[in-house]
Design a protein with these regions (language model features):
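Metal-dependent phosphohydrolase cores
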Residues: 1-179
Length: 179
């Protein structure tokens, strides 16, 4: 039996297997607690896709970073998005980057997230659909979709915290061009 404190190494960041297991279990628990129809199909997708394994581009690069980032976004939204149902916060916070598990197809990862959820038969409210599908869309006024505003703030907060904790992984190395 593998030791659960075995370390996984990627790009200079250690993540314990126990941490990854805890993150997976916590996310599944939160999602099941929503009681939303179709949630088990989405959870099965998460468990069989790269959602719990992959990192993000530009932040949370470590193995399991995507799930960790999504959990951080959810937790931030839970404390700052007052007035929204807990199930909407869970769906938006935990599924906003789901599209990063799918092959690129010309759409942004937010829109791919919505497509995946649609294919799995998971129903979204109009506001959830807009928040997830357009969370990086600068052309959409943040005031027209308050849930998207909360998602964008939480997404930026999680990313900034990771970059602050791992500055050595955020430098862009530029090649010196000779003239």
């Amino acid at each position: 039996m593998r030791d659960l404190v075995q370390e996984s190494w990627l790009r200079g960041v250690y993540v314990s297997m126990q941490t990854m297991t805890d993150t997976r279990d916590r996310i599944c628990e939160i999602l099941r607690a929503t009681g939303r129809p179709g949630m088990e199909a989405v959870i099965n997708y998460l468990l069989t896709s790269s959602y719990f394994k992959r990192g993000c581009y530009g932040h949370h690069k470590e193995y399991g970073g995507l799930a960790q980032h999504s959990l951080e976004v959810y937790e931030h939204m839970l404390t700052h998005a007052e007035g929204y149902p807990a199930d909407s916060i869970a769906v938006v916070g935990l599924f906003h980057d789901l599209g990063k598990t799918a092959k690129r197809d010309g759409r942004g990862h937010g829109r791919r997230s919505v497509v995946i959820l649609d294919r799995l038969g998971f129903a979204l409210t109009d506001e959830e659909r807009t928040a997830i599908g357009r969370h990086h869309d600068r052309s959409l006024d943040l005031l027209t979709c308050p849930l998207r505003r909360h998602l964008t703030a939480a997404d930026c907060t999680s990313t900034a915290r990771w970059k602050h904790a791992h500055p050595e992984l955020c430098h862009h190395h530029h090649r010196k061009v000779s003239q």
